[in-house]
């Protein structure tokens, strides 16, 4: 463990957790042991002295884009998907608080009875008080992914880096599950991610990150303790940033 926060390169980060990551091996909903493991990983990073914010997806409950493909109005489908992210945020909050992690859920869609509305200054103040802020409701607008929400919130919170927890340990030039010869990138620039259509994040999210010089790190959430390792430049990951030497 690093006891001196000044020894860390990244002192404030945003973690993007997909809804699929919360359901483990299930086909729907939540796998609480998996959520507890993710929460333990987050606690390990907090104990390093790092300020942490989180954006959660909702794909384990509802995917708006899939519903739109079968005929549902896209905007309505996306709003339902946003509600799914609130369910996930509240679930994650409860598991984290069982581990004595102070949290606040802030939703882009106001739901005063269950969580706070998203107000940038309030969110920053929570983080200054060492609370983990869980952002729910996506951007609050349809036709936007939770990846875009993660990039926007990371920039608004002045985070040093956005870390996206996935099922693979980085960015590959092809799907490693389908192609055993797929090449993994250690680092790659924003332009190449877009040009090569690598689909680690949607194009809009990558473009906003590039414009604001927000580095993105892709890593696997499956291995216990990986979050803390990756934030210290250890372990397996891919970094997306402007300049690659």
From Swiss-Prot:
Where does this chain mainly localize? cytoplasm
**Annotated transmembrane regions:** none
Q: Which family does it belong to?
A: Belongs to the UMP kinase family.
Q: What is its EC number?
A: 2.7.4.22
Main role? Catalyzes the reversible phosphorylation of UMP to UDP.
InterPro entries in the record, alphabetically? AceGlu_kinase-like_sf, Asp/Glu/Uridylate_kinase, Uridylate_kinase, Uridylate_kinase_bac
Q: Describe the reaction catalysed, as an equation.
A: UMP + ATP = UDP + ADP
The entry summarizes how activity is regulated as: Inhibited by UTP.
Which pathway does the record list?
A: Pyrimidine metabolism; CTP biosynthesis via de novo pathway; UDP from UMP (UMPK route): step 1/1
Q: Keyword Nucleotide-binding, does the record have it?
A: yes
The protein here is known as: Uridylate kinase
Q: Which domain of life is it from?
A: Bacteria
Quote the record's binding site residues for ATP: 16-19, 59, 63, 166-167, 172, 175
Keywords of the record: ATP-binding, Cytoplasm, Kinase, Nucleotide-binding, Pyrimidine biosynthesis, Transferase
Q: Which GO terms describe its molecular function?
A: ATP binding; UMP kinase activity
| PANTHER family (UniProt xref) | URIDYLATE KINASE, URIDYLATE KINASE PUMPKIN, CHLOROPLASTIC
Subunit architecture: Homohexamer.
> In which compartments does the protein localize?
Cytoplasm
GO BP term, pick one: UDP biosynthetic process
* Source species of the chain: Rickettsia akari (strain Hartford)
Q: Which residues bind UMP?
A: 58, 78, 139-146
A Gene Ontology cellular-component term:
cytosol
């Amino acid at each position: 463990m690093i006891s001196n926060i000044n020894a860390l390169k990244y002192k404030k980060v945003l973690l993007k957790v997909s809804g699929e990551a919360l359901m483990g091996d299930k086909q729907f909903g939540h796998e609480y042991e998996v959520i507890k493991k993710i929460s333990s990983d987050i606690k390990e990073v907090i104990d390093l002295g790092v300020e942490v914010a989180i954006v959660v997806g909702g794909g384990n409950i509802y995917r708006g884009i899939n519903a739109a493909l079968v005929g549902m109005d896209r905007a309505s489908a996306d709003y339902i998907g946003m509600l799914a992210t609130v369910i996930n945020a509240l679930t994650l909050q409860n598991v984290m608080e069982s581990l004595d992690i102070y949290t606040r859920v802030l939703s882009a869609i106001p739901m005063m009875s269950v969580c706070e509305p998203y107000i940038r200054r309030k969110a920053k103040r929570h983080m200054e008080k060492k609370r983990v802020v869980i952002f729910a409701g996506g951007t609050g607008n349809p036709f936007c992914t939770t990846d875009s929400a993660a990039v926007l919130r990371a920039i608004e919170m002045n985070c040093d880096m956005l870390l996206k927890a996935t099922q693979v340990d980085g960015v590959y030039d092809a799907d490693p599950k389908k192609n055993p010869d797929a090449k993994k990138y250690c680092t790659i620039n924003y332009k190449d991610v877009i040009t090569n259509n690598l689909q680690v994040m949607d194009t809009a999210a990558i473009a906003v990150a590039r414009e604001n010089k927000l580095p993105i790190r892709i890593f696997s959430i499956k291995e216990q303790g990986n979050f803390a390792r990756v934030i210290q430049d250890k372990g397996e990951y891919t970094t997306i940033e402007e300049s690659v030497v």
